[in-house]
Amino acid sequence: MKTLCFLLLTSGLLYLMVKGVGSHPGTFHVRIKCMPKMTAVFGDNCSFYSSMGDLCNNTKSVCCMVPVRMDNI
């Protein structure tokens, strides 16, 4: 029984490595970009702003999280 579980686990992991996690059409991924605060305030299209810890550690920039459909990549 342990051998069967081990084989199922390894085959599942191999499938994910070959296929890719979240690479199915219709799924959403989040792309994060840093932009100057003035650009963010004055019209750059961003659906969600956040402070992402050390990612945008400059006080003059903000993080923009943009949902991207896998069909568009």
From Swiss-Prot:
Q: Which cysteines are joined by disulfide bonds?
A: C34-C63, C46-C64
Query: What subcellular locations does the record give?
Result: Secreted
Q: Which residues form a coiled coil?
A: none
Q: Which UniProt keywords apply?
A: Antibiotic, Antimicrobial, Defensin, Disulfide bond, Secreted, Signal
Q: Which residues form the signal peptide?
A: 1-23
Which BP terms from GO are recorded? Answer: defense response to bacterium
- Look up the record and report any one GO term of the cellular component aspect: extracellular region
Entry-linked InterPro entries: Defb50
Q: Where is it expressed, tissue-wise?
A: Highly expressed in prostate. Not expressed in uterus, epididymis, ovary, testis, spleen, submaxillary gland, thymus, thyroid, pancreas, smooth muscle, skeletal muscle, heart, kidney, lung, liver, eye and brain.
Q: Which family does it belong to?
A: Belongs to the beta-defensin family.
What does the record give as the function of this protein? Has bactericidal activity.
Instruction: Report what the protein is called.
Output: Beta-defensin 50
